[in-house]
UniProtKB/Swiss-Prot annotation:
Ranges: CXXCXGXG motif repeats: 150-157, 167-174, 189-196, 203-210
Quaternary structure annotation from Swiss-Prot or TrEMBL: Homodimer.
Protein's name in the database: Chaperone protein DnaJ
Keyword terms, alphabetized: Chaperone, Cytoplasm, DNA replication, Metal-binding, Repeat, Stress response, Zinc, Zinc-finger
Any one GO MF annotation of this record: ATP binding
Sequence ranges assigned to domain J in this UniProt record: 5-70
Domain description: The J domain is necessary and sufficient to stimulate DnaK ATPase activity. Zinc center 1 plays an important role in the autonomous, DnaK-independent chaperone activity of DnaJ. Zinc center 2 is essential for interaction with DnaK and for DnaJ activity.
Positions that bind Zn(2+) 2: 167, 170, 189, 192
Cofactor or coenzyme needed: Zn(2+)
NCBIfam families: DnaJ_bact, PRK10767.1
Top-level taxonomic group: Bacteria
Biological process terms in GO annotation: chaperone cofactor-dependent protein refolding; DNA replication; protein refolding; response to heat
CC cofactor note: Binds 2 Zn(2+) ions per monomer.
Length: 379
């Protein structure tokens, strides 16, 4: 059974904002949550479906992959939600537990204990590469503005070697409870904002954040055969976590610059090559460039027309994680001579006078059909 469109599952438009997605998910999750529909298998399945849809659409990277490839973005080797294009594993992390705790922790008295640190944000970096780099692979460096752990406090956020203490308001749990009727309402602690710890003496360098802004220089390995839009994950190279929390990841988005000779079609390459009229008429050979830097010679049969295509097997792009290569397709364009000398013009006129019957079968056939059409119109 084919999966439903994720936007349809949540009942939102494709261009819905993050807030719209969250509101739609909260409403549906409250309606179909198993605790409210005990024993109802249909509701349980519906809850799983909307959870899966929200898990993908709430994440910018996974949503972009879904918008481009649909459900196929997470199948056929892409490894499910959290895998990237071309098989790279990006492990975005669902974050479903966060919204679950936010909704049902407060409503039903659930929720995780507060943590002393928060994970850093993931970062995106757009990198343009050449077609040659995509063909053979490359190693390049990027400079990324980010945040790193504060050296003064070793990322703790506390000044002078002191350590954070348990929040006295929530006793280190990160949440406070209040009884309302039959329900126990659990909310994020307003004193520590859910961290469970407070800093009495904040670090003067980072202001108690445990991290500072800095530009990092990183090396990026680009494998041979990558395509436009491929994403590469550099684990742990995102923003530093808050007060010693784990860092996020950095995602490199590749864009392949246009090439002056070649156009790419998957693993194949296409190239238009002009040839002289005389070569097309009499036959001959031409040398053409290839993506690996070598030259290939093509034999041009006599009578070759514009648009004729030659295939050079194995002269195309590399295939990711494979020794195979695509093909190179050469399309010839017969060039009409310009700026003829008087002598050249005379020779062409002599050629024309020598007789044209059978020399131009396509044009002769075309005009023969035109004459027939005119004759039919007169009748």
């Amino acid at each position: 059974m084919s999966k439903r469109d994720y936007y349809e599952v949540l009942g939102v438009q494709k261009g819905a904002s993050a807030d719209d997605l969250k509101k739609a998910y909260r409403k549906l999750a409250m309606q179909y949550h198993p605790d409210r529909n005990q024993g109802d298998k249909a509701a349980e399945q519906k809850f799983k479906e909307i959870s899966e849809a929200y898990d993908v659409l709430k994440d910018d990277q996974k949503r972009a992959a879904y918008d481009r490839f649909g459900h196929a973005a997470f199948e056929n080797g892409r490894g499910g939600p959290g895998a990237g294009a071309a098989g790279f594993d990006f492990n975005f992390g669902s974050g479903f537990a966060d919204i679950f705790d936010e909704m049902f922790g407060e409503f039903m008295g659930r929720g995780r204990a507060g943590q002393t640190s928060n994970r850093g944000a993931d970062l995106r970096y757009n990198l343009e590469i050449t077609l040659e780099d995509a063909f053979k692979g490359a190693t390049t460096t990027v400079r990324v503005p980010t945040s790193v752990a504060c050296e003064s406090c070793n990322g703790t956020g506390a000044e002078g070697g002191s350590t954070p203490i348990a929040c006295p308001t929530c006793n280190g749990h990160g949440k406070v409870r209040a009884q309302q009727g039959f329900f126990t309402i659990e909310r994020t602690c307003p004193a520590c904002h859910g961290v469970g710890r407070v800093i009495k003496d904040p670090c003067r360098t980072c202001g108690g954040q445990g991290r500072v802004r800095k530009e990092k220089t990183l090396s990026v390995n680009i494998p041979a055969g990558v395509e436009d839009g491929t994403r590469i994950r550099l684990a742990g190279e995102g923003e530093a976590g808050l007060r010693g929390g784990p860092p996020g990841d950095l995602y490199i988005f590749l864009a392949i610059a246009p090439h002056r000779f070649f156009q790419r079609d998957g693993a194949n390459l296409q190239c238009r090559v002009p040839i002289p009229m005389t070569t097309a008429a009499l036959g001959g050979s031409v040398e053409v460039p290839t993506i690996d830097g070598s030259r290939a010679k093509i034999a041009i049969p006599a009578g070759t027309q514009t648009g004729h295509q030659f295939r050079l097997k194995g002269k195309g792009m590399s295939v990711l994680r494979s020794p195979a290569r695509g093909d190179l397709y050469i399309q010839v364009v017969v060039e009409t001579p310009v700026n003829l000398t008087k002598k050249q013009q005379e020779l062409l006129r002599e050629f024309e006078k020598a007789g044209q019957d059978g020399l131009h079968p396509e044009s002769e056939g075309f005009f023969a059909k035109v004459k027939e059409l005119w004759a039919d119109l007169k009748d």
